[in-house]
Amino acid sequence: APLPVYQFLMKLWRLREGMILLLPAPLYHSAPHAALNFTIRVGGTTVIMERFDPELYLSLIEKHRITDSQMVPTMFSRMLKLPEEVRNAYDVSSLEVVVHGAAPCPVQVKQQMIEWWGPVILEYYGATEAQGLTFCHSEEWLTHPGTVGQVKFGEMHILDDDMQPCAVGTSGTVWFVNASEFEYFNDAERTAEAYSPDRTMSTVGDMGYVDEEGYLYLTDRA
C-alpha cells in the first residue's frame, strides 16, 4: 500500500499518470531523486539532463512536451538572463507544474517567471531531515510575495534564542515539532544542537517569520 507521506506528496505535487518530468538537477540531491521515484511510481516519464543549461532546458521542454519539472532559483535566474528572442523561441505551453525549492527565490525573479510561464510554479520549503514542509501555489504567492507558503506537513514554531515564541512579523529560528527522528553521521554535537532541550522539536537553523495568515517568509538559511 502507498505510504502516507507518498500519498500526501502525490496530491500536493499533483503527481499523475502520463506526466512527463524534466529533471535538470543532479540525482544525488534528495529532492530530484524523490521526484524521479514518484514519477516512475505513477507511470510517468522522466527526462534527465546531464547538467543544467538554460537554452537546452527550454529546447527539451518543447521537444518532449514536458509537463512537469523540479528546479532551484538559480536556474530561473540563468534562464531570465537569456536574450528575450531566445526565451521566446521555445514553446513551453505544455508545462503544468514546476516545483522549486532548496534556496530562497528573489521576489523579482519569481515574479518574472510567473509572468513568463503562467501560474504553474509551486514552491516548497523543507529539508532532507524531513521535519516539516510548507507549500505555496503561484496564486497564493502573488498575494503574498516572498513567502514560501503555509505549513502542509508537520507543526511549525518561530522561536527566539530563549526558545520563546516570536510575535507575528518577528524573525526567529524555524522549528518543527518532531515528525521524524534524524541524526547527522558521526556528528553527535551537531545532532544535539538540532534538537530542543526536551527533544520535542528540531531545526536545521533557518530563520524566518510568519504573517497573520501563517505564511512563512525566510530571512536566512543555515
Regions found by a protein language model. Give the residues of each.
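Conserved AMP-binding/adenylation subdomain of ANL enzymes
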Residues: 1-24, 28-67, 82
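Active-site phosphate/pyrophosphate- and oxyanion-stabilizing loops and adjacent acidic/basic residues
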Residues: 7, 77, 111, 146, ...
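Short, P/G- and charge-enriched loop/turn segments at secondary-structure junctions
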Residues: 9-10, 140-147, 194-196
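A structural signal for the hydrophobic beta-strands that form the central parallel beta-sheet
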Residues: 23, 48, 71, 100, ...
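Gly/Ser/Thr-rich phosphate-binding loop
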Residues: 41-42, 63-71, 80-144, 152-157, ...
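Alpha-helix capping/helix-boundary segments
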Residues: 53, 75-76, 105
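Short coil-to-beta-strand transition motifs
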Residues: 148-153, 202
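Conserved ATP-binding/catalytic segment of the ANL
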Residues: 167-169, 175-222
